[in-house]
Amino acid sequence: MSQQLIGSEYTVYRSGDGNGGFTPTTVKVPTLGPHDILVCITHSGVCHTDITFCQMGAPIALGHEGVGIVEAVGSLVTQFNVGDRAGGGFHRDACGHCKYCLSGRDIYCYNRVIFGEGDFDNGTFGKYYIGKETYLHKIPEGLASEHAAPLQCAGATVYAALKATVTPEKRVGILGIGGLGHLAIQYANKMGADVVIYSTSTSKEAEARQLGAKEFHLLDNMFDDVKAPIDVLVICGTKYPDWDRVMTKEFLARVGVIVPLAAPVHGPLSLPAGAMFFQGYHVFSSLVGSRNVHDEMLEFSARHGIKPMVQIFKHDGAKTIREVFELVKMNKMRYRAVLEMGD
């Protein structure tokens, strides 16, 4: 690592200003550990989770969907070279030897470090991000950095859930076409499933079909024209449906799976117990993807031409981040915001 980089200052944007916002904070590039990598961020996705942590008031360096160029590597790094593209920012470390790590589920390691649970001085809204070699991911050729950035959280979240629940013969219902939903359409379609969309607006129908949807229904009449039961229902919107009507064998096939990805996380998930028991329904939760699934997601995306629809904002400091946050909170983003760093 160049000695000129050690101690050089840059700005991170730290939540916890006491008013639901964030504060620009100056930090210094540390001496890298043997397995650390210094990434000069070129693009960072903006996720609603960043806004949530601002509202919670915890002092966390914001940003967890970063892509950039490797600028320096620790002495024992073997998987990356200076000049490589790397992505990451949500899942940052794990013990490597527990039953979760050894079975490819390191995201659930009891000693994990993820965005918001540790490493509070390190975020992807700043110029630099310091990542562990094993928790950064090479960006495949053919996947532009502005498209790869949102995949570091949103893409991994959706892909991991669908990989665990979807097979080619399934009918997959996706409720909500937003930052997660428009990716879910693409992944489920390329996995061979028949994709059924439930949305609040007919204005999104043409777009949904272009992304790979076979059927489109408005939420208000989602139970009125059921051609066949769906096998998997992925919740990508901010509100739950009427569970009493969802959990019938006419709408959700027996042994069907409910996947809540973007539902209200602070409220209860109340489901009719009788339907759960007698129809064999399951609930499957997903928190991004472990390392192997994350890498697979990036390769799958590049191979099948899957990319998020993004709005790019030239990163001009705190004012740009505040502008993007407001657009996200007003549900005016279509569909993922990306900060593009300056020189």
Briefly describe each language-model feature range.
Residues 1-5, 291-343:
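C-terminal hydrophobic helical "lid"/dimerization subdomain
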Residues 65-67, 85, 100, 128, ...:
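Residue-level marker of beta-strand positions
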Residues 141-221:
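Mid-domain Rossmann-like dinucleotide-binding core that forms the NAD(H)/NADP(H) cofactor-binding site
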Residues 164-171, 194-196, 205-284, 322, ...:
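Glycine-rich cofactor phosphate-binding loops and adjacent beta1-alpha1 units
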Residues 201, 264, 289:
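Residues in the short beta-alpha loop(s) of Rossmann-like NAD(P)-binding domains
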Residues 257-259, 270-311:
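Rossmann-fold dehydrogenase core element
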